[in-house]
Amino acid sequence: MSKRLRVEDDFNPVYPYGYARNQNIPFLTPPFVSSDGFQNFPPGVLSLKLADPIAIVNGNVSLKVGGGLTLQDGTGKLTVNADPPLQLTNNKLGIALDAPFDVIDNKLTLLAGHGLSIITKETSTLPGLRNTLVVLTGKGIGTESTDNGGTVCVRVGEGGGLSFNNDGDLVAFNKKEDKRTLWTTPDTSPNCKIDQDKDSKLTLVLTKCGSQILANVSLIVVDGKYKIINNNTQPALKGFTIKLLFDENGVLMESSNLGKSYWNFRNENSIMSTAYEKAIGFMPNLVAYPKPTAGSKKYARDIVYGNIYLGGKPDQPVTIKTTFNQETGCEYSITFDFSWAKTYVNVEFETTSFTFSYIAQE
């Protein structure tokens, strides 16, 4: 004989099998549905849990697609938009390479040919060059930095006679930058002090010829007591001295009789606008013409004698004595002693040119 289970009239036979009085109990997910991927939202509705890039579009599960991705019509495949040099090969995104690029050890690199190299920590310790592409240079070629970046340049040795002209051509002689000639310019403007400032024009040209210096000198006195020689009224005036003193770099010193601003490398018929910083190659050789020391022997070769003529007249001679490295307070020196034995009356001191040579320091 069977029995019937007695239940209350308000029992709800639909899961969760509650009673009418339990209406505040939230709707529960049926026990046969996993909570992984499902949710009870809104209450009483079984729905999917969605996380980006999954979305519901027009009631369908869809995929949010950003830039660079596309869903193909018809096939529904998700593909990558590849613009050159990117490309799809065998369902893989890659990069199209052309010389000089390559992939080595799974890394994009640059193929460097002859004369080029990629500097690494194994090849150089200079931090400024590491991981950069550089030009390998040999003798005579170098690099330098400019406002527009690095440049490859030809290395021109100082004092070698080579330079670049205004067109950028390498020349052995540049009339606008003649560093084979130190001079005072050929004009007659005063540049020297004998007795008073700018009382004379000393014309001196030093031209480097290998190990020798070819020199030419002349003098015009334009003011002061030596302008007109009159030994009847000034019998004691029988000579004077002009000294050129140079420092260890061959730069003319302020204590010289010749004005420093009038002495420089040649630029056509003038001098270069920028003062020179080094001219040792024009200096008298310290071995051939040693500086005087206690007990040292003085040789006749240290002196160059010659005759110049006042007003260009052969009967008005003046002796010019040139000595080298005999002055103190300097590294190098050239000294000109002008003297005359003849009695001159109202003769203007304007000399002919005198040419001589001496052994160069370099």
Curated annotation (Swiss-Prot):
GO terms for cellular component: host cell nucleus; viral capsid. InterPro entries: Adeno_fibre, Adeno_fibre_knob, Adenovirus_pIV-like_att, Attachment_protein_shaft_sf. The keyword Lipoprotein does not apply. It comes from the Viruses. GO terms for biological process: adhesion receptor-mediated virion attachment to host cell; cell adhesion; symbiont entry into host cell. It is found in: Virion; Host nucleus. Induction: Expressed in the late phase of the viral replicative cycle. Keywords: Capsid protein, Host nucleus, Host-virus interaction, Late protein, Viral attachment to host adhesion receptor, Viral attachment to host cell, Virion, Virus entry into host cell. Forms spikes that protrude from each vertex of the icosahedral capsid. Interacts with host receptor CXCAR to provide virion initial attachment to target cell. Fiber proteins are shed during virus entry, when virus is still at the cell surface. All late proteins expressed from the major late promoter are produced by alternative splicing and alternative polyadenylation of the same gene giving rise to non-overlapping ORFs. A leader sequence is present in the N-terminus of all these mRNAs and is recognized by the viral shutoff protein to provide expression although conventional translation via ribosome scanning from the cap has been shut off in the host cell. Belongs to the adenoviridae fiber family. Homotrimer. Interacts with host receptor CXCAR. Interacts (via N-terminal tail region) with pentons. The tail region anchors the fiber to penton base capsomers, whereas the shaft, built from several repeated motifs, allows the knob to protrude from the virion. This is Fiber protein. It comes from Human adenovirus D serotype 9 (HAdV-9). The lineage of its organism: Viruses, Varidnaviria, Bamfordvirae, Preplasmiviricota, Tectiliviricetes.
